[in-house]
UniProtKB/Swiss-Prot annotation:
Record-annotated Glycine radical domain positions: 5-127
Protein name listed in UniProt: Autonomous glycyl radical cofactor
InterPro entries reported for this sequence: Auton_GlycylRad_Cofactor (IPR050244), Form_AcTrfase_GR_CS (IPR019777), Gly_radical (IPR001150), Glycyl_radical_cofactor_GrcA (IPR011140)
GO MF terms, alphabetically ordered: formate C-acetyltransferase activity
Modified-residue entries (Glycine radical), positions: 102
UniProt keyword terms in alphabetical order: Organic radical
Amino acid sequence: MVTGIQITKANDSALINSFWLLDEEKSQARCVCAKSGYSEDQIVPMSDLGQIEYREIPLEIKPEVRVEGGQHLNVNVLRRETLEDAVKHPENYPQLTIRVSGYAVRFNSLTPEQQRDVIARTFTASL
C-alpha cells in the first residue's frame, strides 16, 4: 500500500515540508516535491530518509486503466461515382480529401494506382 506523507521534522533540512509517497512493500519513497536536494519522481530507499516525523496525506488512488488491442476504421463518406469522376476530371475536385491509413490526403495527390486501390478497398460488391 502506498502512503502519502509530508515530512515535518528531519535531520536533513532539505526534507522538511517535502511530500513523498511511501511504498512499504518495496521499502521505497518517491519524491512528489521538495525544496532542494531531491527531484520530482526521484525514488530512494526509505532508509535514505533517515529519522523523520511526518503527517499522513490522504490519497485517492484510482485503478490503473489498461487498454490493449483495439481497432482502427477509416470512413470515407462518398459515392463510388464521385471518386471515379475525380479520377477522370481531377480539376473538378481540387479539395477532395479522403482518409488513407489514418491520414487525411487529397485524392488528386495520389498516384493513379493508389486511387484505384482506394476505390477498390472502399467499395466492395458484398461483405
